[in-house]
Amino acid sequence: MVINMDFDITVIGYIAGTLTTFASLPQLIKSLKEKDMSNISLAFVITFTTGLTLWLIYGILRNDYPIIVFNILSLMFWIPITYLKIRDEMRKS
């Protein structure tokens, strides 16, 4: 049996990307419904969003489509969360 390692590795990348990207969706939905971001750390949100951005840049530089696609999708979830968290923190002060 011949296994195409490039294909297998790409499939693993897409599965991992799907799981990690959509893992944040319930948090986004909950936060938007409740209009409450107090259960999320500002430091975490900023660090995580920065990390996603750096992963996207890395994926672009390496021309790695799973990394590019899933970090764009993740940023689509986390940029609004970041905005809402910063807005809520500014309202508190």
Curated annotation (Swiss-Prot):
Residues annotated as signal peptide: none
GO terms for MF: sugar transmembrane transporter activity
Keyword list, A-Z: Cell membrane, Membrane, Transmembrane, Transmembrane helix
Pfam families: PQ-loop
GO cellular component labels: plasma membrane
Subcellular location: Cell membrane
Name of the molecule in the record: Uncharacterized protein MJ0110
Source species taxonomy: Archaea, Methanobacteriati, Methanobacteriota, Methanomada group, Methanococci
